[in-house]
């Protein structure tokens, strides 16, 4: 089943910023193995990105097969970059299984993804790899590592999730990520890609605007939050947080998500999406595994920042420099 989502007319934006060029874009949401697809856009020269939605299980090879199918479809449709969600490699039943299934960055699974990137000729955002770091022997804990591969399969950036999700939501059950995971020590400077400069984050990080502001002030044009939101927080907070991060940073926001039931103990909300710098959801996945596509218009982003120069109007003398730019 296919569904088209078209950017609505920005009547109020045109009134606010009469010189602002509003791109007329359409994007496509697809389930795996569609029979035929077409992208309707008046700006086909703009870079195309694909956002993949999956239901990971403890079966790593089956998960890879599912992700590879979506990545190959994204490449066939002309995407230059495909985003995979947090825990694209697996979602285990408990912390002990998580540690058992984890691998180092130089392990077999990441090698399969480097080969996939080379085969398809596109960049991959691997949104949350269960990484056995160099301190594995000492800590017996892993990192939730966002890995960015270029089209030649080389690792160009790694970001280890800095905010761990230790929460207890009524109706959703407790989560204590720190039982098996170490927090990352630092942020990663934005990385230049064919779609624009990308700032890396992971899931729960989106609740801390300082991180997003720091990445934006360091030059990010696209913020990405690969996630595995639950069934209670998802409907209440998912879209609201993503749109807020896009509006306050004037960045595109790309959020690949886990969806559906992973096993008897866990399910995820889904609703992967792309939000533009005005805060409009310009692409959204349908229910179940699949992908959605959106074009990134950096000229639109720059015009919006000129017409609404919020970063020039900040008052750090009053409230400090929240989200201090990265060195």
From Swiss-Prot:
Q: Where is the CN hydrolase domain?
A: 46-298
Q: Where are the transmembrane segments?
A: none
Q: Which InterPro entries match?
A: C-N_Hydrolase (IPR003010), C-N_Hydrolase_sf (IPR036526), Nit1/2_C-N_Hydrolase (IPR045254), UPF0012_CS (IPR001110)
Name its GO BP terms in alphabetical order. Answer: amide catabolic process
- UniProt transit peptide range: 1-13
Catalytic reactions on record: N-(4-oxoglutaryl)-L-cysteinylglycine + H2O = L-cysteinylglycine + 2-oxoglutarate
Name the Enzyme Commission number(s) assigned to this protein.
3.5.1.128
Q: In which tissues is it expressed?
A: Detected in heart, brain, placenta, liver, skeletal muscle, kidney and pancreas.
Family annotation (PROSITE patterns): CN_HYDROLASE (PS50263), UPF0012 (PS01227)
Which GO CC terms are listed, alphabetically?
cytoplasm; mitochondrion; nucleus
Which residues does the Swiss-Prot or TrEMBL record annotate as the active site? 86 (proton acceptor), 161 (proton donor), 203 (nucleophile)
State one molecular function term (GO).
Answer: deaminated glutathione amidase activity
Note the CDD domains from the entry: nit
One Pfam match: CN_hydrolase
Keyword list, A-Z: Cytoplasm, Hydrolase, Mitochondrion, Transit peptide
Enzyme class label: hydrolase
Q: What does this protein do?
A: Catalyzes the hydrolysis of the amide bond in N-(4-oxoglutarate)-L-cysteinylglycine (deaminated glutathione), a metabolite repair reaction to dispose of the harmful deaminated glutathione. Plays a role in cell growth and apoptosis: loss of expression promotes cell growth, resistance to DNA damage stress and increased incidence to NMBA-induced tumors. Has tumor suppressor properties that enhances the apoptotic responsiveness in cancer cells; this effect is additive to the tumor suppressor activity of FHIT. It is also a negative regulator of primary T-cells.
**Record's miscellaneous remark:** According to Rosetta Stone theory, the existence of a fusion protein in one genome predicts that the separate polypeptides expressed in other organisms function in the same cellular or biochemical pathway. In Drosophila melanogaster and Caenorhabditis elegans, NitFhit is a fusion protein composed of a C-terminal Fhit domain and a domain related to plant and bacterial nitrilase.
- Which family does the similarity line name? Belongs to the carbon-nitrogen hydrolase superfamily. NIT1/NIT2 family.
What is the protein's given name? Deaminated glutathione amidase
Organism, by scientific name, is Homo sapiens (Human)
Q: Which gene encodes it?
A: NIT1
